[in-house]
């Protein structure tokens, strides 16, 4: 309770909640506005990715930039300059890591470097918070390590949550920037490239499931001429409802995934094949798990445990006869 300065940990929390509220309202308005407009005027419009990317992205960028500063600020009155001095190394490392990943993925839009650097800044900023809390660089390694182990669980929970956010942002930016889609007509023996891999179409095979029939396509995946994986993709027909579906084949390489989907057959005997390369996509889900773990660790802090009040013992009123006998 009490008053606090804008530059403080309380101020950072207020800024966090304000930006999240405005961002949520923006998404809600963009989702419901077409429905409301159609109900009132019968006019149909579409609100798609351009609107959400322009508004939500620009709203979240300041928040992502401010997140590492929050734990560095003191309660009531913080020192922004001191926080900057503690985070400049993390910012430099984040920029270098962003550039390395950008060029490792063969480039892309220049703004992608900003997004990647911001993601790494969240990760390195969370580690920097633990580093300075433990006193590394000011104390001997043994003392700093002891202090690190003695930090409250809420400190580790906060760092985990911020690292998880950075990992999720890394996955979102990487997929948005470096994702490739290849649509090609293939016949058995033909090849296609995606994500540095060469896929060879080996042919089709009929299959039977418990309640469907399917045509399965087999692909061999090679890297530098060496077979590293294979994948099946199929088109199914559920016999009861006569409902066709396409089952994409998915292969995971580290934190990236390759999707292979069968399209329509062509008149010349070929088959349309769609191949998606989604680099770092698993970071989106990994970051979510890390954020959840951070919340669990924070809630397990002994300082946040609420004690159960002990029941008062019932006092039994003495019987008058027993009191008289005791007095005698």
Model-based region annotation:
Residues 1-328:
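Solvent-exposed, non-transmembrane regions of integral membrane proteins
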């Amino acid at each position: 309770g009490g008053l606090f300065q804008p530059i403080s940990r309380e101020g950072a929390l207020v800024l966090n909640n304000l930006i999240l509220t405005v961002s949520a309202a923006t998404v809600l308005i963009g989702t419901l506005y077409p429905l409301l407009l159609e109900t009132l005027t019968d006019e149909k419009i579409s609100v798609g990715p351009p609107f959400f990317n322009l508004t939500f992205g620009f709203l979240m960028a300041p928040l992502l930039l401010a997140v590492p500063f929050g734990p560095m600020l003191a309660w009531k009155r913080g020192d922004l300059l001191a926080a900057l001095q503690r985070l400049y190394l993390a910012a430099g490392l984040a920029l270098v890591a962003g550039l390395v990943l950008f060029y490792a993925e063969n480039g892309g839009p220049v703004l992608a470097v900003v997004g990647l650097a911001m993601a790494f800044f969240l990760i390195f900023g969370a580690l920097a918070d633990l580093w300075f809390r433990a006193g590394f660089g000011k104390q001997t390694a043994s003392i700093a390590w002891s202090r690190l182990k003695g930090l409250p669980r809420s400190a580790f929970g906060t760092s985990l949550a911020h690292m998880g956010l950075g990992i999720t942002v890394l996955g979102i930016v990487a997929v948005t920037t470096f994702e490739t889609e290849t649509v090609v007509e293939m016949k058995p023996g033909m090849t296609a490239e995606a994500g540095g891999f060469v896929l060879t179409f080996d042919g089709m095979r009929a299959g039977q499931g418990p309640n469907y029939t399917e045509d399965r396509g087999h692909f061999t995946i090679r890297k530098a001429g060496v077979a590293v994986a294979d994948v099946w993709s199929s088109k199914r027909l559920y016999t009861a409802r006569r409902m066709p579906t396409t089952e994409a084949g998915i292969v995971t390489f580290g934190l990236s995934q390759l999707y292979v989907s069968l399209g329509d057959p062509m008149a010349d005997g070929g088959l349309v094949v769609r191949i998606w390369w989604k680099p770092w996509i698993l970071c989106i889900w990994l970051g979510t798990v890390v954020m959840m773990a951070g919340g669990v660790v924070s809630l397990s802090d002994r300082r946040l445990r609420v004690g159960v009040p002990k029941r008062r013992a019932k006092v039994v009123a003495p019987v008058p006869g027993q009191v008289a006998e005791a007095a005698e």
